[in-house]
Amino acid sequence: WIMGHMVNANYQIDEFVNLGANSIETDVSFDSSANPEYTYHGVPCDCRRWCKKWEYFNNFLKALRKATTPGDSKYHEKLVLVVFDLKTGSLYDNQAYDAGKKLAKNLLQHYWNNGNNGGRAYIVLSIPNLAHYKLITGFKETLKTEGHPELMEKVGYDFSGNDDIGDVANAYKKAGVTGHVWQSDGITNCLLRGLDRVRKAVANRDSSNGYINKVYYWTVDKRQSTRDALDAGVDGIMTNYPDVIADVLNESAYKAKFRIASYDDNPWETFKN
């Protein structure tokens, strides 16, 4: 999965997919009542990026729905996964459940079209704080209450705080999550970060009793760091330059081993060689 980083304005969906991304990451900011309000990152953000592009969350969802609904004039067949980077740092811990509930209602109405031929992409809810695990509970219970528990088949999870892998496993236990787990590791492109924790996550993914299904690394903009991440065995790379990742995947060393994921590749299944 080539994951376009910080796609927060509607027009950037086309821009990143046209550069080679089959997945995008979008920042979601919340108001003081835990309503998802804007797709917005803000300052500081990655080097060589403009941090202030934004859209109202529901308007972004509508554009995303069009981009992932077969038959729509804006449809992109290869856009198959969306990571919502949930900026819950502005919320109190006790608002996490409400944030999940409100997020689910927004997605149900504006992305899934109330279960009636909505967008088809798989969705990852990426949460920066382990203490906010109840966001998952709120999301799940709301879809059930609203009569669409089947949509949870399209939803996965990520805790993005680079926490100890054992602590992450524990948070999932509390949230009642037993699958659909993506594990992120990384740092802004302005700084360097080694691959030690990525290797631990990959080892967990590949062990018989691990909780992780997929591992992705962020934010990778250079050819050499792309090669290093692929060599470490990641499933996804988040980038500001999808074309760079696509180029490396075309190199002879990687062409035979990796391919770009399509809609038929289940993002919740651990890949077995």
Curated annotation (Swiss-Prot):
Glycosylated residues (UniProt): N250
Keywords: Cytolysis, Dermonecrotic toxin, Disulfide bond, Glycoprotein, Hemolysis, Lipid degradation, Lipid metabolism, Lyase, Magnesium, Metal-binding, Secreted, Toxin
Cofactors: Mg(2+)
Catalytic activity: an N-(acyl)-sphingosylphosphocholine = an N-(acyl)-sphingosyl-1,3-cyclic phosphate + choline; an N-(acyl)-sphingosylphosphoethanolamine = an N-(acyl)-sphingosyl-1,3-cyclic phosphate + ethanolamine; a 1-acyl-sn-glycero-3-phosphocholine = a 1-acyl-sn-glycero-2,3-cyclic phosphate + choline; a 1-acyl-sn-glycero-3-phosphoethanolamine = a 1-acyl-sn-glycero-2,3-cyclic phosphate + ethanolamine
Organism: Loxosceles apachea (Apache recluse spider)
Similarity comment: family membership: Belongs to the arthropod phospholipase D family. Class II subfamily.
Cofactor binding, note field: Binds 1 Mg(2+) ion per subunit.
InterPro entries: PLC-like_Pdiesterase_TIM-brl (IPR017946)
Active-site residues, as the UniProt record annotates them: H5, H41
Disulfide bond as UniProt keyword: yes
Protein name as it appears in the record: Dermonecrotic toxin LapSicTox-alphaIB2
A cellular component annotation (GO) from this entry: extracellular region
Enzyme Commission (EC) number: 4.6.1.-
Localization, UniProt: Secreted
Tissues where the protein occurs: Expressed by the venom gland.
